[in-house]
From Swiss-Prot:
This is Basic phospholipase A2 S2-22. InterPro entries: PLipase_A2, PLipase_A2_Asp_AS, PLipase_A2_dom, PLipase_A2_dom_sf, PLipase_A2_His_AS. The keyword Protein biosynthesis does not apply. Keywords: Calcium, Disulfide bond, Hemostasis impairing toxin, Hydrolase, Lipid degradation, Lipid metabolism, Metal-binding, Platelet aggregation inhibiting toxin, Secreted, Signal, Toxin. Disulfide bonds join 38-99, 54-144, 56-72, 71-127, 78-120, 88-113, 106-118. CDD domains: PLA2c (cd00125). Its cofactor is Ca(2+). PANTHER family: PHOSPHOLIPASE A2, PHOSPHOLIPASE A2 FAMILY MEMBER.
């Protein structure tokens, strides 16, 4: 084998090892984002929910600060139930749904994890659409204990 080939092979191996440390993006967050847009008819960007209150976004602790934050806590709890009782990986579960006139609708033919996770997301998206958005509750994680 030529030294140049060995260098290329070594570079590929090193890059693959480095890439294994990068956590992949959960697949169904794209679906959840689309559901949120469906439910609120595009009135509020999905990014507004990424760091809202004590429960919207990654993790959660303390007491929900308002109705919208309660929607996020309920969604977190629903995902916890999906993991516990359904043995699902909710962040990785891909499901089918459609955007109807009354918001997101899960595919009735699905059962088990797909249906459970879809219902978690659809319920949360509809809850988000109904709840008022208080700008003062954006990026307040330091207040959540």
């Amino acid at each position: 084998m030529y030294p140049a080939h060995l260098l290329v092979l070594l570079a590929v191996c090193v890059s693959l090892l480095g890439a294994s440390d990068i956590p992949p993006q959960p697949l169904n967050l794209v679906q959840f984002s689309n559901m949120i847009q469906c439910a609120n008819h595009g009135r509020r960007p999905t990014s507004n929910y990424m760091d809202y209150g004590c429960y919207c976004g990654k993790g959660g602790s303390g007491t929900p600060v308002d109705e919208l934050d309660r929607c996020c806590k309920i969604h977190d709890d629903c995902y916890g139930e999906a993991e516990k009782s359904q043995k699902c990986a909710p962040y990785w579960t891909w499901y089918t749904w459609k955007c109807g006139s009354d918001g997101p609708q899960c595919d009735d033919s699905k059962t088990g994890c797909q249906r459970f996770v879809c219902d978690c997301d659809a319920t949360a998206a509809k809850c988000f659409a109904k709840a008022p958005y208080n700008k003062e509750n954006y990026n307040i994680k330091t207040r959540c204990q």
